[in-house]
Amino acid sequence: RKMKEQKKKRRIEGMDALRGFAILGVVLYHVMPGRFPGGFLGVNMFLVLSGYLIYKTSVWDLEHGEYAAGRFYKKRCIRIYPPLLIMIAAVWGILAVSMPEVAKGRGGEVLSIVGGYNNFWQIRQNASYFARMSQQSPYTHLWAIAIEMQFYLMWPLLFWLLRKLKKHTSMTAARTAVLVLVILGGLRMSIVYRPTEDVSRLYYGTDTRIYALFLGMFIAMIQKDVISFVQRRLPLWFINSLTAAGLVVMTGAYFIAEGQMPYIYQGGMFADGILCALILLLISVGSMGKWL
């Protein structure tokens, strides 16, 4: 019980609300794309939170003698696959009865979901996330889980490298390395973008979206020092006001952002990821998380 209570204390108050807010954005985008054309940006918050949690959880496990690569993979599989398989089966069952023509020929797609490469599968299929077609896959939104699974696959090696860097140099060096990954990942989308080409490659690509996971990691790495620094220098009302302003801007983006506009891929997506990371950090510093 004591360890469970300690794990709960590691969570930021309001984190579940942020996750729900991100999911709501994506759902609203799919249900009412005309009213919420920017709801797809909710994926950024989802990925930032995942990067944050995976770093914090791994550090906690390491400090308590519970971290091992095999154990990490086992925990991820237990967390991901049961609900994922149930969802896949439930959706297919509903479609088989209500829309059998849509349910047909989904074997390759389901395999890509279970195998963790659905984003690459969708790129190869030229499956535009922003197209509104009657035959659009009901599993289109699962591309983000594929990026998470790929990140988890390489996580033990990345975590090991960061620990070695910290041990032989400093925590500052480890943070700098992650910040470099954030910047390179964020710039990648702008570099690859071509105005005359379909944006699906950029939207689904692991190389163009993984920066959000690195952002979450970076926030987890600097969180303790930032809290100590900011709380001594800024009044609580000011911190909460910044948090509220960030949430307002994020909400506004759900209403006005357009997924196929050039500005999204020329820094807009990256800027939104940074906004998500700052909101997460501000909630951990201030008290607004208690209200969410």
What are these regions (language model features)?
Residues 4-292:
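Membrane-interface helix/loop caps of multi-pass membrane proteins
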